[in-house]
Amino acid sequence: MIRRSPRGPRQLRTVAVAAIAVLFGSTALATPSHAGTPFDVDCADATDALAVELCLAQASAAGTDDPGLGVDEIDSSRNLRQIASLPKPAPFDTESSLNSDLAFQGRYAFVGNYNGFVIYDIANPRRPRLVSQVVCPGGQNDVSVHGDLLFLSTDSSRSDDSCASTSQSASVKESWEGIKIFDIRDKENPRYVKSVETNCGSHTHTLVPAKSRAFVYLYVSSYSPSTNFPDCQPPHDLISIVKVPLKKPTDAAVVATPAIFPDGGNPGGNGSSTTTGCHDITAYPQKDLAAGACMGDGVLLDISDREAPRVIHQVRDTTNFAFWHSATFNNSGTKVVFTDELGGGGAATCNPTIGPDRGANAIYDITGTGDARTLVFRSYFKIPRTNGSTENCVAHNGSLIPVLGRDIMVQAWYQGGISVWDFTNSARPQEIAYWERGPVSDTRMVTGGPWSTYYYNGYIYSSDIQKGLDVLDLKDWRTASAKLVRFPELNVQTQPWYLSW
């Protein structure tokens, strides 16, 4: 069923605190299976203030007499329409086989999945076509592409680096995690050519072009060390930098492991996560800048020396940010949007109990010049709709829409759906479009919804964890100029520059 809604947001009323015991018993909040999720809460035994609040939020959403959207029911603003949807192909069509990140090149979209990746032909966005899929287990399998190469992140401890590997504890020295490299010249037959092991694996990676066109670098983000893990020892205050010769990718290797937090990051215990590495880094090569979302900290980096990134400024929000997850620059490089993945992506945080400032985006202006640049907080943005207790919902991956004269972003919110919002005025962001699919289940929490939602060459593409690939068309006067912008290749964490007024 499709519901087109010109009305205001759905609203759910709150319920008494006492509902926790009745509604949850000893049930734990569901979380994605990726390593390092900061909150996995048993609501019956919750004592930490943040854990209790997440449980309260679940109870609040569950106690409403407003049914919200039905299972798979669609609601949207009038200016955003779904024009195509392809389900996950077998064997990726199981509940535990989660779709992850997206990359683009020419007429192709590359969709990561915890069990491998899929290549789609999107020459006709209204009729995308599956070209090939590679079965290669190892979550999250975030993808990036450059020329004839595809890079895949493995942050799931494996028995070896092959695509036939099995799960094996990181406490075993011989276990493997890191980067896999594929030759994708033949899109119908990708070929695995190289692996590079990295400390603590590769939760995500960021492709950073070298100033010489002979190489690319991968900034590898990983976290959650343990004294029991031989290849992931504390304090792990670093990133790994992999250098890839484009003409001989089999020579790819780790060339540096710079410490991002040599004096230690956020110690935790203050409402935020303990910093033991970065979750995600967005590079803006045109500006020689990067922004790191690093668990309990946000950082602005100078990457003019690609093998020696330097922290220019570091920020922390112990009031509203639980887990610094990802970052997006505006096109002029004067703002950064950081996201807070409160609840690790597995909790229902889009409700009145949690409120509008947590599990949200934080917009920072970049002020000053050179090494005197600083990040100055301006405002928060969170979707205004309330989701139910079986809908994991929090800020997640998005991209700029390449609009002239404005700062507009499209973003995934898991089961909160897709939001298009304008942060041209960084102190007063506003939503201008949305699209949402109803819960995967109305009886239990199933990790679902859009993982990554990006704008590419005139259309919005969304990798839905359970449902597959969605394509949407945004028709709004504020974004009309974006239809004229074409990128030959797009890895969203490698932010491209486009002409602006």
What are these regions (language model features)?
Residues 2-35:
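Secretory targeting and sorting signals
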Residues 19-20, 35-501:
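Feature marking well-ordered beta-strand scaffolds used for ligand recognition
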